[in-house]
Structure formats: C-alpha cells, structure tokens
Amino acid sequence: MRYAAIAGFIALGWLLFFRTPGPGEVSAAARSAATAAGCGDLEQPVVPDPSRVHLAPGESFDYPDRPAAAGPHDAAPLPPDPHVYPIPVPETQGVHNLEHAYVIIYYRPAAEGGLDQETIDRLAAIARDEGRVIMAPYPALPDDRAFALLAWNTRWMCPATISADQAITMATSFIDAFRGTSVAPEAPHGLLGPLFQK
C-alpha cells in the first residue's frame, strides 16, 4: 500500500511539474467565425522542420513567409510586459516568444486599412488579461489580411472585414488551444505551467 501511494505521488508530481500539455483544438465556434469572416485556413505547420537557431545580437533575418511563426530568431525574446505594444515589434524577437509557447496577435492598424478601433481595443483587453499573449501592430501583413493569430509554427489570418465578435471568438479559442502547449519547443513544463504564465 505504501509503495502504491509513493508511486501515485510520483505520477502526480510528474503531471504537475514536468508534463507539458499538448495543443488543443480550436472550437467549432471559432472555425465558424473564421469561415463567416473570410479568413484563411488554420496553417499548421507553417514551415516544415523550422530552424530554432539564435541570431547574433542585432542580426536581422528575412523570413520567407510572413508574419513569421517559426524559424531563426533573436537570442532575446520580447519582454512579457507590456502585453500590448503600441508600435511594431522586432519580428525576430516575437518568433523567440513563440518558441516559448506564447501567442501573438498581430493586426494592421485602422489608419492603414486594417481592423476597426473597437476590434483592436477588445483584442487588446484579452491580451492584457492573459499570460503569454502579446499584441502588436504589423503593417506588413499581406494585402488581403489585417489580423493574424500566431503560435509556434501555427498561423491563422483574416481580412479587415472581420467583426469584433468574430475576432474575439477566434482569439480566445486559439489562445486556449495553443498557448503554453507542446506545440512550442520550449513550452513551460507541467500542468501547473499555465498558472505562472502571466
């Protein structure tokens, strides 16, 4: 009996501290919102066998497919605060955050034919309230896209016509499915990992 209890504690400890949860599925509601908004498919993987090489300080990288969801990246990630950046961020640093199981919300600003301000504000509220979520403008999104959700080697992009409700439905489901999971090579460990994501 004693050995069974010890084995149980060891198994529980492994689950709580070492096992990283796998990625989930985006909800049917999120997929329906994406279809109604005219979004592209959920891309996974974005690139086969992405590199995880750290670039030298100050070194840039020309990602062949943007916004980049994986690949060579800066040795330093973006700081977790602020969660919402008012200006574009260095893409090489953002990719490093993705490697650590963050989700990034990129958008084209309204002044550049992108998302309306209500949608931006509502997405920013989600980013501020969630750990391991960063939001920043990304003016270089493809011409027909104004909103992108990224996790490591995972991307979902939508046009500017997406409504605030559709964007919120997609973002919350995407965050739940991919943040802090083993889809990222350097995700936090253990089922308790998400408790420390803020």
Predicted stretch roles:
Residues 17-25:
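Intrinsic disorder/low-complexity signal
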Residues 24-26, 30-93:
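Surface-exposed, low-hydrophobicity interaction/linker segments
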Residues 83-134:
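Mid-length scaffold segments of soluble, non-membrane domains
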Residues 8, 19, 66-68, 112:
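Short linear sequence elements within intrinsically disordered, low-complexity coil regions
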Residues 2-18:
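Hydrophobic membrane-insertion alpha-helices, especially the h-region
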Residues 25, 125-198:
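Helix-rich interaction surfaces within compact, conserved domain-sized segments
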